[in-house]
Amino acid sequence: MTRRYWNINLEEMMEAGVHFGHGIKKWNPRMAPYIYANRKGIHITNLTKTARFLAEACDLVFDAASRGRQFLIVGTKKQAAALVARAAIKARCHYVNKKWLGGMLTNWSTTETRLHQFRDLRTEQKTGRLNRLPKRDAAILKRQLSHLQTYLGGIKYMTGLPDIVIILDQQEEYTALRECITLGIPTICLIDTDCDPDLADLPIPANDDAMASIRLILNKLVFAICEGRSSSIRNP
């Protein structure tokens, strides 16, 4: 895998609060190699290691994108929902930014059936066929469509399991992470000081609570994916 320059700046990461971890009482000892210090009862993440792992992740997604691989971005925190959707759409990735439905990946046949139903309902809505149904029937189907849009809207074009899953909060998205582990799908995870780095294929030690931190990490990964996709177009 070729190493590239991704303009990862330690000062920029400090300004975004990437280095702030959790209180020392709320930590996972397996994170010790990634912790630089304890300041006023708060663990401080070693940003040099963050930069190294983030660069590795950018190299990985660039190479994967240049080979046409499919990505799924998972971040269901309410405050990050819009950010996740924008970033994923920009990089032409699938995403889940509401609730993770258990079995979304491990029970793919059921998810696929729901997606077919979702696409059919969208077609019926676009062609106006829903409005030609009796009001009660139309109302029921519109509620179904709204529900499917909320939870499956970000994966509506997904036709198979993703090649790489990017997880923005290991604790919050634990079910998604376990499904990836079960299926052997590689994961890139933001890991705060209360996380288990051994569960991720490629961990990025970083603050997973601050929006500025999440935005910075996600923007770097999305930029690398976009560059990889452009590379495949330039060099088919």
Curated annotation (Swiss-Prot):
The Gene Ontology terms for molecular function here are: structural constituent of ribosome
Alphabetical list of PROSITE patterns matching this protein: RIBOSOMAL_S2_1 (PS00962), RIBOSOMAL_S2_2 (PS00963)
Instruction: State the family named in the UniProt similarity comment for this chain.
Output: Belongs to the universal ribosomal protein uS2 family.
Identify the keywords attached in UniProt to this record, alphabetized: Chloroplast, Plastid, Ribonucleoprotein, Ribosomal protein
Q: What is this protein called?
A: Small ribosomal subunit protein uS2c
Q: InterPro entries from the xrefs?
A: Ribosomal_uS2 (IPR001865), Ribosomal_uS2_bac/mit/plastid (IPR005706), Ribosomal_uS2_CS (IPR018130), Ribosomal_uS2_flav_dom_sf (IPR023591)
Q: Name where it mostly resides.
A: plastid
Query: Which compartments does it reside in?
Result: Plastid, Chloroplast
Provenance organism? Oenothera argillicola (Appalachian evening primrose)
Which is one Gene Ontology cellular component term of this protein? mitochondrial small ribosomal subunit
Coiled coil recorded as keyword: no
Q: Is-annotated flag, keyword Zinc? A: no
List the CDD domains.
Answer: RPS2
Task: State the Gene Ontology BP annotations.
Answer: translation
The record's section on PANTHER family has: 30S RIBOSOMAL PROTEIN S2 PROKARYOTIC AND ORGANELLAR, SMALL RIBOSOMAL SUBUNIT PROTEIN US2M
Alphabetical list of Gene3D superfamilies matching this protein:
Glucose-6-phosphate isomerase like protein, domain 1, Helix hairpin bin
